[in-house]
Amino acid sequence: MRKVKSARKLGRTASHRKATLANLSTQLLLYKRIETTEAKAKETRKYVEKIITKAKGGTVHAQRIIFKKIRDKAAIRELFEDIVGKVADRNGGYTRVIKLAPRYGDAAKMAVIELVDYHEAPESAPVKAKQDRSKRVRGSKKTQEGSEKAEVSASAGEAAAVTEEK
């Protein structure tokens, strides 16, 4: 009897799907946060969770198995030196998928996938007090005064030209 496979096909052949997941995983390990479609993000989450769990073993055999899936030395180095240390006490759930607004061009469902322990809240900039309304640039007296001076000098130049003609 035929059984249904749980993985998404993503509209690709098997080799293309494998390469796509490997590339998305590499970028996630290097940059800790990537934006992609929701379906790709969910599949990448499955793929990366298994890789990180395997890497927590820390053996040479684990490195070789992971290198067969992700063929990028910088990503593997980052995984074993940095990421495994941060997630050592965590039992799964290394990534999070956050849904975003649909993409403008084709309305595809978008999402951000990120490593959980790397998402620090950005430090907020110090709050500045608003300037007094009279000091704001829009429609200020300074710009109006400057344009009046230019008009006066232009009319004075015309008057001088008229007197020279006489």
Curated annotation (Swiss-Prot):
Residues 122-166 are annotated as: Disordered. Gene3D superfamilies: Ribosomal protein L17. It comes from the Bacteria. GO terms for cellular component: cytosolic large ribosomal subunit. PROSITE patterns: RIBOSOMAL_L17. Keywords: Ribonucleoprotein, Ribosomal protein. SUPFAM superfamilies: Prokaryotic ribosomal protein L17. Residues 152-166 have a biased composition (Low complexity). Part of the 50S ribosomal subunit. Contacts protein L32. PANTHER family: LARGE RIBOSOMAL SUBUNIT PROTEIN BL17M, RIBOSOMAL PROTEIN L17. NCBIfam families: L17 (TIGR00059). This is Large ribosomal subunit protein bL17.
